[in-house]
Amino acid sequence: MTRKSLQRLIAACTLTLTGSAFAATELVVQYPYGGTFKETFAEIKTGFEAQYPDIKLNFRAPYENYEDATQKIMREAITKRLPDISFQGLNRIRPLVDRDIAVSLEPFIAKEQGFDKEGYHKAMLDIGTHNNEVYGLPFAVSLPIAYYNMDLVRQAGWDEHNLPKTWDEVIQLAQKIDALGDDVTGLVYGWQITGNWLWQAPVFSQGGSMLSADEKTVSFGGGEGQWALETFARFFKEGGMKNYSSADGQQSFYSGKAGIWFWSTSNVTKAEQQIGDKFEMKTNFFPSVKAGGTLPAGGNAIVMLTKDADKQDAAWKFIKFSTSGKGAAIVAQTTGYMPPNKKANEEYLTDFYRTHPNHYTAVKQLPLMTDWYAFPGKNGLKITQIIHDHMQSIASGDRMNESGAVLNDMVSDVQKYLPR
């Protein structure tokens, strides 16, 4: 071998070794609601890859919603095409744990020093805990709130400094706004939102629950559920609410054609961007929460799915970065979700909330927060659809005047699909 040939061989080997030593670990990540989180994950990707240049993020096309996220994971677990990391609805972690798809984060948390000092408090960890182990770290948390078109509120003659505190007052204001013109609707209640979230909210607000403590019997058939479903029917009978899809209802508010919109805090930033200077928007509390009542925490958590040891190390770095004070602040500033991480609120967002009162509404509701309920067993998604379909029978007008009978049917149908 000539000296020149030897040099070429050494150079080639050096390049090969260098490439191997510094080959980036690729993490495949999938999250929901692309319209809401696109800017969020663009910022997180930039920050994370700058801090960890040896790890590259590959985002799959976003899930349509949390049900879609769970269904895809179930299928991909069979076909072995799971992403390394998935952002799952807070009420959808349970089925992934039950099927041994999600990876416990306990071994990773155990190795951390001063984890609590970084803002990871017990209540935050509890949200993603199942069978006494943490399987998901909350990434974005939301609560239901009211959005008001203050221009229409004033035109309707309502005291703008005393927005409705009860559903009776909401319906009264909706009637006044509805009377302003044929092209204006008083009220939009986004009941179709994922996971029956805005069905659970009014039931929980009265101290009710979805199932009995042993999870064997439907419990929303009592007074709390009766009140919640009849109030829902009143939105159509008295409040003039139309049978909008979620998208159409949202757009009617953004365009200035709806006076009140009930939805998640997650859309505050997007709403402000969409509305611009068309009208003044103000957020306010979810009405009629009685003493002892609660509201379900919406949002999502990061779940590790990869079983590869090397990828798990990289995945844990991404999970920590995204849920850290800095990562959580990005979420709050680019959406309307609240950061579950204490450090984000205490160090990064004090000035932000002072100048963004619409974002702060939900933060003031935090003492009311409870778990977003996940039905047990293999039929959880089926039960979600059953509840949706019964509510649709009221929204469509078919059974608008028989909320009691609809509730009885809903209870009976859900009971059939509970684990025996």
What are these regions (language model features)?
Residues 360-413:
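C-terminal capping/gating helix-and-loop segments adjacent to ligand/active sites or protein-protein/ligand interfaces
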Residues 46, 50-51, 56, 156, ...:
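Extracytoplasmic/periplasmic substrate-recognition and gating elements
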Residues 26-43, 62-66, 142, 194, ...:
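Extracytoplasmic "Venus flytrap"
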Residues 24-35, 55-60, 85, 135, ...:
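Short, well-ordered beta-strand elements
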Residues 47-120, 129, 155-157, 162, ...:
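Extracytoplasmic "Venus flytrap"/periplasmic binding protein-like
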Residues 130-139, 144, 168-217, 224, ...:
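Extracytoplasmic/periplasmic solute-binding protein
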Residues 171-178, 214-243, 286:
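Glycine-centered hinge/linker elements that transmit conformational signals in sensory
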Residues 90-145, 171, 198, 202, ...:
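Hinge/lid segment of periplasmic solute-binding proteins
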